[in-house]
UniProtKB/Swiss-Prot annotation:
The gene is RRG9. This is Required for respiratory growth protein 9, mitochondrial. Residues 1-12 form a transit peptide. Residues 86-117, 218-240 are annotated as: Disordered. It comes from the Eukaryota. Required for respiratory activity and maintenance and expression of the mitochondrial genome. It is found in: Mitochondrion. Its main location: mitochondrion. Keywords: Mitochondrion, Transit peptide.
Length: 264
């Protein structure tokens, strides 16, 4: 019997060969490495046949041990049974379960947070408008010259019924704006009135032609002599009173003139 210290074997070709070594009476220990599995031979009880005296007769078949074919082949090939390292200590290395990135960085504590990104100019102005106009953007309303004349006519006929507050609520304006309209004494001249009429006529013609192209209104007949028709229209308009002219223009602009119904 030979007492043999641990000697690492080469990688086994198959697991079946390792099982046969275990069945033959060889004690093996399984050791793990980073790359692969290795078997180390801890203790070989015997590598050859037992030499028994002739007078001894075996009582059972288990008393005689025969080496496995693998052990015989290794002995025939001159496999050295001397230990390579007598004082070798096997240390197991385990990989770290926590990644390096998750470990706390001492320098990270000293670094402060990034400063807030500077807002753009249009965003700052938008926030300022939201704070200033909480109900939304409501620019001051501007009345047309004809609507201004209608406000004056209504207030002149019945100041108690058509007061400043009533007119401001109807025209969706501030009472101060209505008060300034009533206080103002400016009136357009005849030349300015004529330019205004021509502008409204061109606008009416442009809108009518556009609606007729869409099929919403019938085609408009072109006048044979525009100069004569223009002069006749100007004469008829000059004969009409101011409130009727204003009512006609307001109806064309799809405005509900409250004061037109009262003046009729």
């Amino acid at each position: 019997m030979f007492g043999i210290t641990s000697r690492p074997y080469h990688r086994w070709s198959s697991f079946a060969q390792a099982l046969r070594i275990l069945q033959s009476g060889t004690t093996l220990a399984l050791e793990l490495d980073h790359s692969s599995l290795f078997f180390s031979k801890r203790n070989i009880t015997s590598c050859c046949h037992h030499t028994k005296p002739a007078s001894h007769t075996p009582t059972s078949s288990n008393s005689i041990w025969t080496p496995s074919p693998l052990a015989e082949s290794r002995l025939r090939s001159g496999y050295s049974l001397k230990p390579a390292h007598t004082n070798r200590v096997v240390t197991r290395r385990y990989a770290s379960t926590t990644p390096k990135d998750s470990q706390p960085d001492p320098q990270a504590k000293t670094v402060s947070k990034r400063p807030a990104k500077k807002m753009e100019q249009w965003r700052l102005q938008k926030e300022a408008l939201k704070k200033k106009f909480q109900e939304g953007w409501a620019p001051p309303k501007r009345l047309s010259p004809d609507a201004i004349e209608g406000v004056r006519e209504l207030h002149q006929q019945n100041p108690q019924k058509f007061s400043t507050a009533v007119l401001a609520e109807h025209f969706k304006m501030s009472p101060e704006a209505i008060r300034r309209i009533l206080k103002s004494k400016w009136r357009p001249s005849e030349k300015e009135m004529e330019k205004r009429r021509e502008r409204w006529e061109r606008r009416e013609t442009r809108i009518w032609d556009h609606m007729s192209e869409l099929g919403l209104r019938p085609l408009r007949k072109r006048p044979s002599s525009p100069a004569s028709d223009k002069s006749s229209d100007a004469e008829t308009r000059n004969r009409q009173p101011l409130h009727s002219i204003a009512s006609t223009l307001l109806i064309q602009r799809d405005i509900s003139p409250m004061w037109v119904l009262l003046l009729r």
